[in-house]
Amino acid sequence: MSQPADTIAVIDGDEWAFKACSAAEGRAIIAKHIPSGREKEFNHRTEFRDFLKTQHGGKFTEDQFEIRDVQYPEPIENVLFTLKQMIAGVCAEVNATGYQILISGPDNFRLDIDLPKRYRTPPNKRAPNGTEKAGRYKESRGDSLRPVHLSDAKKYLIKKHGALTTYRCEADDALATRGYAGRIAELKGAAQWIIPCTQDKDAMGVESRLYNPNKPGLGIMDNRGFGQLVEMGKDIKGHGRMWLYFQILLGDSTDNYNPRDILEWATYQAGGTPKPFGEKKVYSVLKDCQDDRDAWKAMYDQYKLWYPEEVEYVSWTDEVMRKDAIDIMQMYVDCAHMQRWENDRINVRQTLEKMGVIECSK
């Protein structure tokens, strides 16, 4: 089908504001030598560590220093000009007649998912019980340095470009909802394309049209249907529902969730070392699936291998939880699934029953 005259570009305002602000900001670190009080600036921590190895015969150690991050932002006008150019650029690239910008609100349903608290590094001599990390969804980003102008950039998008703020979901969910609704309307005869414009890899699993501004050579993609996974060197690429299934098994370290967290911590507690389960392993589980039933059975079987019996764990809220493989799978489906409509949620147990993977509960 040829592109109709009426085309709307839907833009992730979170992503674009962050990108524009980062491009207009220099960063460095200040290392303060605690015993002497002397300070020295470095471009980054790697440069600082190289300095420790090569200067003064390596007599300095990292624990003798306090590190603080410093930011050197350009004027806010530079950020706003960049955003204006980015919007105009993507509209031209997809031949859009209009655009809509979406920004995440203060709340997010995924923050309520009772992910395990024990998202930790292994026990070691310095930390016999392991080192506790954040367990809440996306909490690993909590201490990351945010661009100085980020808040003002989002306010600009709202005031000058009519950006809408989401409720109880992230901007990428709202993009998915908008794109899915547009694709369904299109299949029913609507003479309009709705094109989510984002570099977010999760968008590859949404049934909609899609444009990645970072990869213009891919053009306007159509992620309809079951999709596929493809080996590309060391990486696995994919689209359609197969890409969602891939994420459900792999997890996402950027968003701070891993379906093997509970298993890995139990293995460490028992004195063992968990075996790695990366992209290639996930691909091997899903590569022969021919339809959705195959994929759901493969995912369920893998979760049952990880959690053959009901397990107990401590959530990030310090609650003791007891869950079986399906309940655990539900958590990670909730993390990975982008909403197709408001309050959209895949019920794992019902889906497995519908697919005939497990017997219907009475």
Say what each PLM segment does.
Residues A96, P123-S361:
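Extended two-metal-dependent nuclease catalytic cores across DNA- and RNA-processing enzymes
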